[in-house]
Design a protein with these regions (language model features):
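Hydrophobic, aromatic-enriched alpha-helical segments typical of multi-pass transmembrane helices
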Residues: 2-255
Length: 255
């Protein structure tokens, strides 16, 4: 009779290759943490600017604003938001690295949706187009030129808060929802972080251009977004710390 020997069961421990791969992600985690803190700064600065200097309501008022203060004109046309959106792209990539072992397909989907939202939003922003049109309007010498530039400015403003903006905004909310769902199953990020991500993503499903409701929800969403960025930054910096790859790999093995 043949006796079958069975090896005693042991807890799974992270291998050398897994630790090496995790160490390779450290610069990305650090970059994502810095990006999250920059996003916090963007929100803190952008909200007072919006409240103190609301965007003009007509093309001529926009041109006047750019003539008086070009920087304020760019800020009212979401220049800071462009920076924040660019930082979001870096955060998506860092979060993919941190959560890829929990659900790789879902994190890939969330990251792709997030990066598409960044791309679409950049395509919709017309801040520098308006700056150029304003300069041309100031230099125009005939009424025909001014009328043409006013029409071009109107078309540019329509693009700024048109379909591309709405799609980019909503896709950003969808990406956050997907990533937050994966976070709920992770031992790396806290459950409060995941729940705040779910709340922020849900509030972003209605774009800011959707009347008063959209505007109010967009402003309300900034509060949980601010907290989420702070929590994300803290965790990403922890993952980037020396020897953190061991604890991270063990936490994933236990998930």
């Amino acid at each position: 009779m043949t006796t079958v020997l069975q090896e005693p069961s042991v807890a799974r421990t992270p291998g050398t290759e897994e630790l090496r791969i995790e160490a390779d992600w450290k610069p990305i985690y650090r970059m994502g943490g810095v990006a999250a803190l920059i996003s916090v700064a963007v929100i803190v600065v952008a909200v007072p600017i919006y409240l103190i200097s609301p965007p003009p309501t007509s093309v001529l008022d926009w041109f006047t604003l750019f003539h008086r203060n070009a920087l304020l004109g760019l800020l009212d046309l979401d220049l800071l938001m462009l920076i924040g959106i660019a930082m979001s792209g870096l955060i998506y990539i860092a979060l993919y690295g941190a959560l890829r072992q929990i659900n790789r397909p879902l994190m890939a989907l969330g990251t792709i949706v997030g990066l598409v939202s960044v791309t679409v939003y950049f395509a919709s922003n017309t801040a520098f187009n308006m700056l150029s049109l304003s300069s041309q309007y100031d230099a125009a010498t005939t009424e025909a030129e001014r009328s043409r530039l006013l029409a071009a400015g109107q078309a540019t403003l329509a693009i700024w808060q048109g379909s591309a903006y709405d799609i980019g905004y909503v896709l950003g909310g969808v990406a956050m929802l997907i990533i937050a769902v994966v976070m709920l199953r992770s031992a790396v990020f806290s459950r409060p972080t995941a729940y705040i991500g779910l709340l922020t993503g849900a509030l972003m499903l209605i774009p800011a251009t959707a009347g008063t409701v959209g505007l109010v929800l967009s402003l309300v969403s900034l509060a949980p977004a601010l907290i989420w960025d702070i929590l994300i930054a803290r965790t990403l910096f922890q993952l980037a710390a020396p020897r953190a790859e061991v604890a991270t790999a063990e936490a994933r093995a236990a998930s």
